[in-house]
Amino acid sequence: MGLPTLEFSDSYLDSPDFRERLQCHEIELERTNKFIKELIKDGSLLIGALRNLSMAVQKFSQSLQDFQFECIGDAETDDEISIAQSLKEFARLLIAVEEERRRLIQNANDVLIAPLEKFRKEQIGAAKDGKKKFDKESEKYYSILEKHLNLSAKKKESHLQEADTQIDREHQNFYEASLEYVFKIQEVQEKKKFEFVEPLLSFLQGLFTFYHEGYELAQEFAPYKQQLQFNLQNTRNNFESTRQEVERLMQRMKSANQDYRPPSQWTMEGYLYVQEKRPLGFTWIKHYCTYDKGSKTFTMSVSEMKSSGKMNGLVTSSPEMFKLKSCIRRKTDSIDKRFCFDIEVVERHGIITLQAFSEANRKLWLEAMDGKEPIYTLPAIISKKEEMYLNEAGFNFVRKCIQAVETRGITILGLYRIGGVNSKVQKLMNTTFSPKSPPDIDIDIELWDNKTITSGLKNYLRCLAEPLMTYKLHKDFIIAVKSDDQNYRVEAVHALVHKLPEKNREMLDILIKHLVKVSLHSQQNLMTVSNLGVIFGPTLMRAQEETVAAMMNIKFQNIVVEILIEHYEKIFHTAPDPSIPLPQPQSRSGSRRTRAICLSTGSRKPRGRYTPCLAEPDSDSYSSSPDSTPMGSIESLSSHSSEQNSTTKSASCQPREKSGGIPWIATPSSSNGQKSLGLWTTSPESSSREDATKTDAESDCQSVASVTSPGDVSPPIDLVKKEPYGLSGLKRASASSLRSISAAEGNKSYSGSIQSLTSVGSKETPKASPNPDLPPKMCRRLRLDTASSNGYQRPGSVVAAKAQLFENVGSPKPVSSGRQAKAMYSCKAEHSHELSFPQGAIFSNVYPSVEPGWLKATYEGKTGLVPENYVVFL
């Protein structure tokens, strides 16, 4: 129930009811006053908490800014560089958010605290002053009235008239005070409605402005976030592949002889105890010793472990160097210590007595120093596999396997990822490579299933006496893909492939051509270029020595295979540029990180720090929005190239050829716009470096589930890659273990983790294009003039780089104006500014369009856009 109304006429009567109603208003004003005091106190605490939060976030961002990633190896992949740079990018993003919070905190006192305090003091305070005046006048009036009424009627008339005049004057003063008090109370009650609420509204507006700015930053940050997810997924894939290889190496080291000595620059090295004379006998001091047989140089340095704060607790002294004269095993009965031997050196008189750790270790030292002990063969760490050779039988076997796969199983899910049964694979190998088998033996595809054939093909390549890409060129390939210049990577790999022996290059040509075809069906088999690189990288480029350092280079081996697949036509069907210098060993440099993808260089305009999309809403393409992108990566980016992920409205993209004759693969688009995605996670495993008795059934085989989603919709995903790399439309979703995860419909949140890849799916496996020979038409055209419509693209930002990327997409050769061209495929226009034409149509006045991948041409008197890869110039 509301407050009672105060009438001015009631002030004249000053009835008990009036006083009661007046008291209700006074109680309400007092309650409001206390509430405002508490609100000001709580608001001050809130502002203080915001200030403390801001300081904590700034300190957190500074910690991110100061930390420096270091990776194993002498070079870093593009993914590793992006990840290393990400902490600084996170710090810059947090700083941008805190800048907005700082403005909120600065304005909060003026917007919230000061107006509330002013209202409390000026308005409610004025009402209190009015009450004091009213009470004073009331008390004075009724006191004088009481005295006036007590006057005797016998008083003089003049005295009575004076008393009447005084009482009238006091009553008038009381009446005016009462009216003013009533007016002020009602004024405060009315002003309370806006002067009290307006500061709160202003504060909330500022708070929501801060939140909205955070939302805008999140929107603008989305492209970088998505690319970083791709980088993280690639790195996770490489880790899974490398970890398995390192684990195998570790297990072999465990099972090897305890005194196994790995290859090094020294003939022999290790710890030895050296007998040193003391005034009261002898003492044995541990030294780290090395010996070079060529120069007969023996060095030893004191090495002792201390539980101090020094690194590793190891204290070493400067090494002493000697030239060895002789080495003799110490007789057992001549010393009470075991495993001893004596050496003579030029620099000292007498002998130096050394103690090895074991009898086998002493034999190794004696053998290295040409001692009198018999020479023992160094233990082998790895049992040699039965070797295969690049002979006629091998070429026939590979061709037959590829023919069988391409005939019946190229679209099978997890092709080459899921291994066959071990016994069947061994039977296939024994049958094919038996000494009694003819070189051109056929493979009965009815007898052998697809998994057995693919595992047999990989097993043959693993068991070659020398890997297909040779030990000699192994380091050169690795150095080539470690280059900062992505164009040079391709050119260097191109040149190195042509340095391979003829048979090796021929076999590599056959295999890579097949892998290109496999990757073109990645929509069905999910074997993208990235996945194939993970599988065949270690197989085609295994290192001569299995060391942890070699395992760390597996990620670069994968990149080599990706380059071979993506640039197959150029590498195998064109001669390399003789002016391209071959790779030279490089020392590790930190300069690449300064050129890493970074979004926060340069000054920032409001809401322009990250450009969230590259086209206007009414254009034919849209950038991926956070609403349609779960936390998991949609596709796996190749670590040696920069790619763009975008979505399309068109549902009728047809295949078409891009430069190099490699078709694109476009994902069917959604028909109703529902956000329905099938999510799948990957845990890729390396499928190489297995023992002869072990196949992919043990190392690679994972459970495979269909990729599903709640509806029959399939939001389109398309990747556009920067030239001169071909195979631009290949999807790079990495998968060794595939499992379906339900995705929520509509605006429900997705449950994928950041380590999970997301894949577009429907209730049924996506069907291939009706005519697989047709290359897909460019599903999206970006208007370059709208590329920066949503924000300022700073130099060096990933969005600016991606905008430039779209400017470079297309044929690497410039198209001259006014030429004629012929249509290789038919095409039906999807927009009014496109041309429809049949196969064989002749176009005139053909010249480049401002939209990448499209040409402007005239056909039958009509001028419009045609897909660049649908035509050939006459």
From Swiss-Prot:
The record's GO CC annotations read:
cytoplasm
Q: Which Pfam families match?
A: BAR_3 (PF16746), PH (PF00169), RhoGAP (PF00620), SH3_9 (PF14604)
Q: Where along the sequence do coiled-coil regions lie?
A: 225-261
- Which positions fall inside the SH3 domain? 816-874
Q: Where is the composition biased (Polar residues)?
A: 667-686, 700-711, 749-762
Against PROSITE patterns, the record matches this protein to: PH_DOMAIN, RHOGAP, SH3
Q: Which residues cross the membrane?
A: none
**Where in the sequence is Phosphotyrosine found?**
376, 870
Query: Tissue-wise, where is it found?
Result: Highly and selectively expressed in smooth muscle cells.
This molecule's function is given as: May influence blood pressure by functioning as a GTPase-activating protein for RHOA in vascular smooth muscle.
- Output this protein's name: Rho GTPase-activating protein 42
Give the originating organism: Homo sapiens (Human)
Q: Which gene encodes it?
A: ARHGAP42
